[in-house]
């Protein structure tokens, strides 16, 4: 993978579901903010040439880092939603990032993406006409619930995947799709959904389950365990 890409990391969320007064991306993990692990995981790939972190305006928790692993780290202010923050990050990218360049978008609270998975995403996504996302096939049995909370049926899982990040798309297509969705008042929960709404079909690239998102305190404990395994 020789083509350089920038990564946009939306980090303007407040982590309401986590139940902490501190946004989860800044929670200390082995003495370091969670987001540092995320940034280092992305910067470890030689094809990632810069990072744009989208923070809340006036974010006092942000430490003002300007580089990671010798690569430039820029910041901009985000919006009320994830989609608005991603759009802000894409528009704030430096001039060296052209309209048709591929850009990675990655969750700030997903600190454990493997270098090998990132490599396969970049290889497959940059060779695909639309782009690609990391994802994991659904392996559990899925039940559909009725309005009373009882089981209403069992859903076939053979073609279902859980969408992870990073997600890799061309900057111009993602910007255009996000702007149209915002104008239409449609909430976009991930970047692949933005592309799907334009009639495009991104590629699914399987990744490790260890690339999970920190959503609950149990997830944080799990990540600490993953860190201990690295030693």
UniProtKB/Swiss-Prot annotation:
GO terms for biological process: isopentenyl diphosphate biosynthetic process, methylerythritol 4-phosphate pathway. The record marks 157, 213 as: Positions MEP for the nucleophilic attack. It catalyses: 2-C-methyl-D-erythritol 4-phosphate + CTP + H(+) = 4-CDP-2-C-methyl-D-erythritol + diphosphate. GO terms for molecular function: 2-C-methyl-D-erythritol 4-phosphate cytidylyltransferase activity. Pathway: Isoprenoid biosynthesis; isopentenyl diphosphate biosynthesis via DXP pathway; isopentenyl diphosphate from 1-deoxy-D-xylulose 5-phosphate: step 2/6. Gene3D superfamilies: Spore Coat Polysaccharide Biosynthesis Protein SpsA, Chain A. Keywords: Isoprene biosynthesis, Nucleotidyltransferase, Transferase. InterPro entries: IspD, IspD/TarI, IspD/TarI_cytidylyltransf_bact, ISPD_synthase_CS, Nucleotide-diphossugar_trans. Catalyzes the formation of 4-diphosphocytidyl-2-C-methyl-D-erythritol from CTP and 2-C-methyl-D-erythritol 4-phosphate (MEP). NCBIfam families: ispD. Belongs to the IspD/TarI cytidylyltransferase family. IspD subfamily. This is 2-C-methyl-D-erythritol 4-phosphate cytidylyltransferase. It comes from Xylella fastidiosa (strain M12). The gene is ispD.
């Amino acid at each position: 993978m020789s083509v350089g890409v920038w990564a946009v990391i939306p980090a303007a969320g407040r982590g309401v579901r986590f139940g902490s007064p501190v946004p989860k991306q800044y929670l200390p993990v082995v003495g370091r903010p969670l987001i540092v692990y995320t940034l280092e995981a992305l910067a470890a790939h030689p094809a990632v040439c810069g990072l744009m972190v989208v923070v809340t305006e006036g974010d006092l928790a942000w430490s003002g880092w300007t580089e990671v692993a010798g690569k430039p780290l820029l910041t901009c202010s985000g919006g009320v939603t994830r989609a608005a923050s991603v759009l802000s990050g894409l528009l704030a990218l430096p001039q060296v990032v052209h309209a048709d360049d591929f850009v990675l978008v990655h969750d700030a609270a997903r600190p454990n993406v493997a270098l090998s998975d990132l490599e396969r995403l970049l290889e497959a996504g940059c060779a695909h006409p639309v782009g690609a996302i990391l994802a994991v096939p659904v392996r559990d049995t899925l039940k559909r619930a009725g309005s009373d909370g009882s089981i209403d049926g069992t859903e076939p899982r053979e073609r279902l995947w859980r969408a992870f990040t990073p997600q890799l798309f061309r900057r111009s297509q993602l910007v255009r799709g996000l702007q149209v969705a915002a104008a239409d008042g449609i909430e976009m929960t991930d970047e692949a959904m933005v592309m799907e709404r334009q009639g495009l079909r991104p590629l699914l690239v399987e990744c490790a389950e260890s690339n999970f998102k920190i959503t609950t305190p149990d997830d944080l404990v799990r990540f600490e365990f993953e860190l201990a395994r690295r030693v």
